[in-house]
Swiss-Prot record:
Sequence repeats lie at residues 33-41, 49-55, 56-63, 68-76, 77-83, 84-91, 96-104, 105-111, 112-119, 124-132, 133-139, 140-147, 152-160, 161-167, 168-175, 180-188, 189-195, 196-203, 208-216, 217-223, 224-231, 236-244, 245-251, 252-259, 264-272, 273-279, 280-287, 292-300, 301-307, 308-315, 320-328, 329-335, 336-343, 348-356, 357-363, 364-371, 376-384, 385-391. The gene is EXT3. GO terms for cellular component: extracellular region; primary cell wall. Keywords: Cell wall, Cell wall biogenesis/degradation, Glycoprotein, Hydroxylation, Repeat, Secreted, Signal. It comes from Arabidopsis thaliana (Mouse-ear cress). Residues 33-384 are annotated as: 13 X 9 AA repeats of S-P-P-P-P-V-K-H-Y. This is Extensin-3. It comes from the Eukaryota. Residues 49-391 are annotated as: 13 X 7 AA repeats of S-P-P-P-V-Y-H.
Length: 431
């Protein structure tokens, strides 16, 4: 009997344990009940993966703006179009994207479950873990949502993919230096004849080598820079080397400075006449300004009449211009469109027109030019989209880029070079 009783007790214990486990499992299921929704929410995540599509709506907004401007554009020529867009920028009409945020309303729900997880997930993680084996993948996307920007940056990266190609050019510079030295070696075959100067070497072995530099017309540039390295001149020369392909001759004179060889350099000075031509490249930088002004000038040749509309923005100036309008029998056609925009101006201007004569028109346009000439340049800036290509190489120069900017200074240093030559002669005189 003892054995049957023991077996019964054992079975009862097993049943109780199983029931407790069942209750616990049910309890766990109660906690895991939220996860199921998570599974349902996972699909939304997949749908959210293409949020970029939501970014596309903004363009339509642009169309929205274009819908209103078109009418004026016809009557107001192109200028009105440019003026109308600016205001929207100030108002940040693009802030309307919030509507898409409404579409993101579900994500908040997705975020709400996590908190509970923090409170109870730790207690019953083991069971959920099994069901959440795939969720981990879904948890990774949420972080991007927090950064939100993380999703948008990738596209720019794609556009920046080409710049890396420009990073490769810098290396060529290093090769450029290697290419130039070899030739010098060949030219150094005759230098033996110049070994006669060795006596000077006793005074300045480093200074005497320069004489051979004459035959070493191009190399001198590379040898002379090394000393400057102490003064950091080396950092700035590298960049110039490209544009200063001829300047090497310019550097050759310095060596002569040390001795009476300076008298012979004068002839090279004549050869330096061309270097100024190389200084002309810098002007391209001036193009920076040159590019922006020209466009305005071309487009503004006829605008004089169009400039009169700008005053309307001042409200008060607009009332005074109308007078000239009468004198400008033909222009009235152009002025009539702008007034409609303001409505109010169109009603009161006529009277003043008679008293304001035409001069006011001329005075009103000038100011607009100042205000709009600067606004119009921005388009040219678009043409400057390529310049970024030049900026991409600089990064590689980072090691020396910070001092490579001196390229422009180099142009300024061109004159200093002459002083440098004059400074070197004095020593000989002292000797």
């Amino acid at each position: 009997m003892g054995s049957p009783m023991a077996s019964l007790v054992a079975t009862l214990l097993v049943l109780t344990i199983s029931l407790t486990f069942v209750s616990q499992s049910t309890a766990n299921y109660f906690y895991s009940s939220p996860p199921p929704p998570v599974k349902h929410y996972t699909p939304p995540v997949k749908h959210y993966s293409p949020p970029p599509v939501y970014h596309s709506p903004p363009p339509p907004k642009k169309h929205y703006e274009y819908k209103s401007p078109p009418p004026p554009v016809k009557h107001y020529s192109p200028p009105p179009v440019y003026h109308s867009p600016p205001p929207p920028k100030k108002h940040y009409v693009y802030k309307s994207p919030p509507p898409p945020v409404k579409h993101y309303s579900p994500p908040p729900v997705y975020h709400s479950p996590p908190p509970p997880k923090k409170h109870y997930v730790y207690k019953s993680p083991p069971p959920p873990v099994k069901h959440y084996s795939p969720p981990p993948v879904y948890h990774s996307p949420p972080p991007p949502k927090k950064h939100y920007v993380y999703k948008s940056p990738p596209p720019p990266v794609k556009h920046y993919s080409p710049p890396p190609v420009y990073h490769s050019p810098p290396p060529p510079k290093k090769h450029y230096v290697y290419k130039s030295p070899p030739p010098p070696v060949k030219h150094y075959s005759p230098p033996p004849v110049y070994h006669s100067p060795p006596p000077p070497k006793k005074h300045y072995v480093y200074k005497s080598p320069p004489p051979p530099v004459k035959h070493y017309s191009p190399p001198p540039v590379y040898h002379s820079p090394p000393p400057p390295k102490k003064h950091y001149v080396y950092k700035s020369p590298p960049p110039p080397v490209k544009h200063y392909s001829p300047p090497p001759v310019y550097h050759s004179p310095p060596p002569p400075k040390k001795h009476y060889v300076y008298k012979s350099p004068p002839p090279p000075v004549k050869h330096y006449s061309p270097p100024p031509v190389y200084h002309s490249p810098p002007p391209p930088k001036k193009h920076y300004v040159y590019k922006s002004p020209p466009p305005p000038v071309k487009h503004y040749s006829p605008p004089p009449v169009y400039h009169s509309p700008p005053p309307p923005k001042k409200h008060y100036v607009y009332k005074s211009p109308p007078p000239p309008v009468k004198h400008y029998s033909p222009p009235p056609v152009y002025h009539s469109p702008p007034p409609p925009k303001k409505h109010y101006v169109y009603k009161s201007p006529p009277p003043p027109v008679k008293h304001y004569s035409p001069p006011p028109v001329y005075h009103s346009p000038p100011p607009p030019k100042k205000h709009y000439v600067y606004k119009s340049p921005p388009p040219p800036v678009k043409h400057y989209s390529p310049p970024p290509v030049y900026h991409s190489p600089p990064p590689p120069k980072e090691k020396y880029v910070y001092k490579s900017p001196p390229p422009p200074p180099v142009h300024h240093y061109s004159p200093p070079h002459h002083p440098y030559l004059y400074k070197s002669p004095p020593p000989p005189y002292h000797y």
